[in-house]
Each structure stands twice: as C-alpha cells, then as structure tokens.
Amino acid sequence: MLTVKGLNKSFGENEILKKIDMKIEKGKVIAILGPSGSGKTTLLRCLNALEIPNRGELAFDDFSIDFSKKVKQADILKLRRKSGMVFQAYHLFPHRTALENVMEGPVQVQKRNKEEVRKEAIQLLDKVGLKDKMDLYPFQLSGGQQQRVGIARALAIQPELMLFDEPTSALDPELVGEVLKVIKDLANEGWTMVVVTHEIKFAQEVADEVIFIDGGVIVEQGPPEQIFSAPKEERTQRFLNRILNPL
C-alpha cells in the first residue's frame, strides 16, 4: 500500500530521520515506539507531507513522490488526501461544535454535499460514542471526548491510511482506555493504521508490526511477540526495560 525508501529529514544541520525504509501493507497496524526526540513524530508527519522530507521516496499504490526532486504541490495534496491524521493535542476548531469539526474537511476541502456529509458525520460520532455530544463545543468536552472527535474528523475524509501521533499522551490516565478502544475497533474493522505510542500493552494487542526508532534510524522491527518478548537489539531491550520497569 505505502512504501518508504531512503527517507531523510533535517531541520537545519540537525538530521532527524536517516534513510528510513518501511512498508505499510493494506489492513495492517504498525506501532512506532521510541524515546523522546527519536524522530517518531517527524516520521509520521512525513508520511502525509505535513513535514517535507529532504530526500527519499514515498510510493502509494497508484503514484509515488521522489523528494530528492522538485515536488509538485498537486502530488503533496494527493498524498495528504490519502491519509487522516490524529494529533496529540486534538487540534479541534474551538469555535465549532463536535459535528461541525467532523464536517469541516469533507465540506470545505472536498467540496462535498453538506447534507450528505452531515449524515455521515453523525454516524461517525455515533461510531466513537459521541452522537449525544455532537452539538457541544470542544471546551465542553473532556480530553478523551475531544480526541474521539479528532478520530471521527480524520475518518470523515475517507482516508486509505490513518496516522495517530501519540493519541493518548495528553490524556488523564483514566481517559486513555476510551480512546484506545476506538482505535482497537478500527483495527478490527481492517483499517490501515500507523500509531506512534508509548502504550506497550496496546501495541502488543493490536499491532501487526512494531518499529523501534532511536536517533532517527529504525533500530529494530518485527511482530510484537518478537519485539516485546525477545528483542534482538540491546538498545531495544534497554528502552523496553525502562518503560516496563520504571522504578
């Protein structure tokens, strides 16, 4: 579905991603783990060109972009339309209701029929358990509810790929479960997803493949049972020990 080859990203002289190669297959869930500053979020943002890589290639089923050459804006927009992004900090429009937030992309960007979009948006809010909150504004919602609206908003553009940037990191611990349940349900429905997360149990249960990144490179990748039970790389072992045994 999506193939990444030789992806590099620098900010000034600081090289954040170094020759990243990965493949995302349709219907699979990939969990990306790594310490703070490892390049996880930058990689995720490069996958839909919120950050433009300096070099490397992204190839979807029907087209590819070579970032070592001049990139057409039309290709950037085409790439972005194929993926829905869920952010750490929700990024909802504060002056719009939950329903209006979900409708925004299809109506304003895709120029779809407003009544048709409204029906779909209500169904999506129902899907994430928030149909009864559709007329509330973000400040009237809990963090977990806001993030679930964010998921519905990302789904509304009918993407081929869902990207989650630490979707529970800004939540109180008691609200984490409600967001993870929605993501698990999407996985069970066969959505293709890349999730940057520190939720090890979630990654074990849901991911088809786990990628561990440190220093801008993929240190190790494999099925969750291998990564969590018998990691091959010493750096992966140290990271997991620190996460699983914090004291």
Curated annotation (Swiss-Prot):
Enzyme class: translocase
Membrane topology, as annotated: Peripheral membrane protein
Subcellular location: Cell membrane
An example molecular function term from Gene Ontology annotations: ABC-type amino acid transporter activity
Transport listed as a keyword: yes
Assembly: The complex is composed of two ATP-binding proteins (TcyC), two transmembrane proteins (TcyB) and a solute-binding protein (TcyA).
Role summary: Part of the ABC transporter complex TcyABC involved in L-cystine import. Responsible for energy coupling to the transport system.
Designated name of the protein: L-cystine import ATP-binding protein TcyC
